[in-house]
């Protein structure tokens, strides 16, 4: 079976690499990705023709459009049995493209990492709904997302496949001894308001000085002002947390990310909402205990708190 896997966010999307590593023994896999993204993966064909970013606005639009034209040509001429879409760089253009080209592929599959953008407008809801209805199969990672799709878009249950998020096999957790002087906590991922970094900082501010002297928290990840304009550095200073919080903004390379997880005693997820979290599975892959808010996705993915400590959402205490 010929499968075309479309992924805009390689090489950062370890999930897609792991999926293709598993599928390649049974299927003929081609990954359509952005320029410079291919990684050594025996048995997988790469086509890096999508826009990789980093140009001026006019040239960026031309290169982005050129990448979509190349993708359309691949779908129309590649004779693929399955077109598997992992995500969108700009759904406004890509969803109509997939809907129009569906007749050129056997089965259209989409992994629903996020049911909707976190700041979804009514137009977004209609756009994503159109795409979900056109797809032949939707893959979700928990029952919570399956039910949301059925409730929001009235999709039949047989169209939605619940496949638990796999662990990251490239990770080799080292034997770890808990820190005796200060317990190390880590919150990793792109900074967004729904991830509750402000809740975490307020919780630390409510601790006594003696309690804070025994902990150290690292908040690491990229921050895009259009998605979250909060000045977390100022918030840390305002709450007097400079001595126990390290804010590490920007892209975290693989080696540095590995060091962050290896060093952590616990991983933190004080989220307000989420459809599913790859970062939570990353923590599990490193054999790290997790502290997470008791929102539906985390309730399910921690087996009701059996594999993680849960606390009420938006509750610093």
Give a label for each model feature.
Residues 230-251:
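Nucleotide-activated donor-binding/catalytic signature segment of Leloir-type glycosyltransferases, i.e.
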Residues 178-195, 201-204, 217-220:
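Conserved donor-binding/catalytic core segment of Leloir-type glycosyltransferases
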Residues 259-275, 288:
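Acidic donor-binding loop of glycosyltransferase active sites
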Residues 36-37, 216-230, 250:
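Glycosyltransferase donor-sugar binding loop
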Residues 133-151, 155-171:
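Donor nucleotide-sugar binding/catalytic pocket of nucleotide-sugar-dependent glycosyltransferases
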Residues 4-7, 71-92, 107-109, 266-269:
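Short N-terminal targeting/anchoring amphipathic segment
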Residues 304-305, 309-316:
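Conserved acidic donor-binding segment of nucleotide-sugar-dependent glycosyltransferases
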Residues 1-38, 78, 295:
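N-terminal subdomain of nucleotide-sugar transferases
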């Amino acid at each position: 079976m010929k499968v075309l896997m479309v992924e805009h966010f390689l090489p950062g999307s370890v999930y897609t690499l792991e999926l293709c590593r598993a599928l390649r023994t049974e299927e003929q896999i081609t990954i359509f990705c952005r320029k410079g993204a291919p990684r050594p993966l025996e048995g997988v064909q790469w086509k890096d023709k999508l826009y990789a970013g980093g140009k001026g606005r006019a040239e960026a639009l031309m290169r982005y459009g050129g990448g979509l034209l190349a993708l359309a040509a691949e779908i129309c001429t590649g004779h693929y049995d399955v077109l598997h879409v992992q995500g969108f760089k700009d759904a406004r253009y890509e969803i109509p493209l997939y809907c129009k080209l569906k007749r050129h592929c056997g089965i259209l599959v989409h992994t629903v990492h996020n049911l909707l953008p976190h700041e979804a407008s009514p137009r977004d809801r209609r756009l994503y709904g159109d795409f979900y209805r056109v797809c032949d199969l939707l893959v979700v990672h928990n029952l919570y997302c399956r039910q949301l799709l059925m409730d929001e878009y009235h999709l039949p249950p047989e169209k939605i496949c619940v496949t638990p998020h796999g662990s990251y096999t490239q990770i080799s957790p080292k034997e770890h001894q808990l820190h005796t002087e200060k317990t190390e906590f880590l919150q990793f991922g792109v900074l967004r308001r729904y991830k509750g970094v402000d809740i975490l900082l307020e919780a630390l501010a409510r601790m006594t000085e003696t309690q804070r002297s025994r902990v150290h928290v690292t908040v690491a990840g990229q921050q895009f002002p259009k998605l979250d304009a909060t000045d977390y550095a100022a918030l840390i200073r305002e709450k007097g947390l400079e001595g126990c919080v390290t804010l590490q903004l920007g892209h975290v390379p693989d080696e540095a990310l590995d060091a962050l997880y290896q060093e952590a005693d616990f991983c933190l997820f004080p989220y307000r909402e989420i459809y599913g979290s790859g970062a939570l599975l990353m923590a599990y892959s490193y054999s790290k205990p997790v502290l997470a808010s008791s929102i539906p996705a985390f309730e399910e993915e921690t087996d009701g708190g059996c594999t993680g400590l849960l606390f009420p959402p938006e509750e610093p205490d």
